[in-house]
Amino acid sequence: MEQELAIRTSMAAGLGLVAAAGNLLGGYFVVRKDWPRQFLQYFLALGAGYMLAVAFLEIIPESLALAGRNALFYVLAGFFLVHLFEHTLAPHFHFGEETHAEEMSHHRAQSSVMLGLIIHTFFDGVAIASGFLVSTWLGTVIFIAVFLHKLPEGFTVASVFLACGRGRKKAIQAAAALGAATLLGVLLTSVLQSQLRYALPLSGGVTTYVAATDLLPEVNREPNWRLAVLVFLGVASVLIMQHLFHV
């Protein structure tokens, strides 16, 4: 049992690194100016459906099994924790979109966006590690959900830093900082395994928030039927994976 847990913890750390690399790659697209906007939109759409399905079909039910009805309080707390940072401290920005100088003229805006996204990415890591502490299956489906929005996260923060006149190096460093926050979430959760009954439902609330209020609205702004189909494909992929692999 201990050996199996050690293997799952190692898998969480390894996939946390992969997720962090996704943040860095998103920032690289902005700095290089060869960003595939439509490609990012497809990631957002697929990720929105997939994340919502994982939250409601996997994370929240597992949280209830771990902590009973009290888990729902922590789901709600995770949801509104991100809402607090995004809508109280951070200025308005579009997730996965390029930000221009006239929209982000003050360095406080840059810091606020950075803080909000770091909260996101920290809980990305918490979610990955919490999932693997429960089972390899749960950790894997959560990792996929996290990875699908890593490019847009890195893209967004690097774009904000460039719009604030911080230069390419700082933009890449900001994207790297998001990746580091993800790794920190993985490591802290792996070390504090006794707090799993709180960490998993909190990450469930954050996952629900990111999918429902960050990703889906961006998809709905685009009059593109392909994006709507991809949202449903994201949901369907979780159901198919459950049917084929989840014993």
Question: What positions do the PLM features span?
Answer:
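Intrinsically disordered, metal-sensing/regulatory segments
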Residues: M1-V247
